[in-house]
Amino acid sequence: MTKKAKNVEKVPFEDAMKRLEEIIDLMNQPTTALEASLALYEEADQLMRICESRIQEVEARIKQLSDQRSES
């Protein structure tokens, strides 16, 4: 895994979402070069995977708490 990829994994969820919005804006600009768009796409892909993983973790935790409450 590259250093950039490791740094992306440490990004808080809210910061990752904000960066995804920035990437979308950059990719929608007609002045963004093709190679730059590809790099942005790759970064966005990493950020989306991390966000999805964190959402799944939170959903699992919520389910666990809900199950514990209903057992009480």
Curated annotation (Swiss-Prot):
Pfam family for this entry, one: Exonuc_VII_S
Record EC number: 3.1.11.6
Reactions catalysed according to its record: Exonucleolytic cleavage in either 5'- to 3'- or 3'- to 5'-direction to yield nucleoside 5'-phosphates
GO molecular function annotation: exodeoxyribonuclease VII activity
Top-level taxon of the source organism: Bacteria
HAMAP family, A to Z: Exonuc_7_S
Protein task: Bidirectionally degrades single-stranded DNA into large acid-insoluble oligonucleotides, which are then degraded further into small acid-soluble oligonucleotides.
Designated name of the protein: Exodeoxyribonuclease 7 small subunit
Gene: xseB
